[in-house]
């Protein structure tokens, strides 16, 4: 998130991040791939203290920032920061999230191995959600998985957030 995004911090980034909270089962384990500034993982951890959240970030500078943020916010009991790449990570989770990481075909390759049986991938997407879901239709059929685009909103006045849900 750069300086030009300050005016849209709440609507585009924070509310956008928590909009998917109702799609996540109670007490789920959640992996935020390419966590960057901690979105959506940190806002979800604050809103949903029942979740066990892992923030996965390959860049040292960002991973250090995330560790400081988790400590400052007092989230050490529910949030873990891991420096690493999705394709090298081996643990599985009930929910894997991706926001502004990659196009859906690439994101699936990195994230599907990290989704536990009966788990789900929640990818925050913009208006490209339907198109990207069509691009991966064959992959999902081959894996006996389904995908849908869900429009969710954290607040009645907020812009809708488009989530591609893969299960």
Predicted region positions:
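Conserved SAM-binding loop of SAM-dependent methyltransferases across substrates and taxa
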Residues: 37-50
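S-adenosylmethionine
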Residues: 50-167
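Active-site phosphate/pyrophosphate- and oxyanion-stabilizing loops and adjacent acidic/basic residues
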Residues: 18, 42, 109
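Conserved beta-strand/loop positions that form the S-adenosyl-L-methionine
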Residues: 33-35
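Short loop/turn and capping residues at structural boundaries
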Residues: 4-5, 45, 81, 151
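Class I SAM-dependent transferase core
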Residues: 1-31, 47, 61-75
């Amino acid at each position: 998130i750069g300086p030009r995004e300050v005016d849209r911090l709440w609507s585009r980034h924070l509310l956008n991040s928590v909009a998917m909270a109702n799609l996540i089962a109670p007490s789920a384990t959640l992996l935020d791939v390419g966590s960057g500034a901690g979105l959506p993982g940190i806002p979800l951890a604050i809103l949903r203290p029942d979740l066990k959240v892992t923030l996965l970030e390959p860049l040292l500078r960002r991973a250090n920032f995330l560790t400081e943020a988790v400590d400052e916010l007092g989230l050490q009991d529910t949030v873990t920061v891991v420096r690493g790449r999705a394709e090298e990570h081996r643990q599985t989770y009930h929910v894997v999230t991706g926001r502004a990481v990659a196009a859906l075909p690439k994101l699936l390759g990195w994230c599907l191995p990290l989704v536990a049986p009966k788990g789900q991938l929640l990818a925050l997407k913009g208006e490209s959600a339907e198109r990207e879901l069509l691009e991966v239709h064959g992959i999902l059929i081959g894996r006996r998985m389904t995908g849908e685009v869900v429009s969710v909103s954290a607040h009645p006045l907020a812009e809708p957030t488009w989530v591609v849900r893969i299960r």
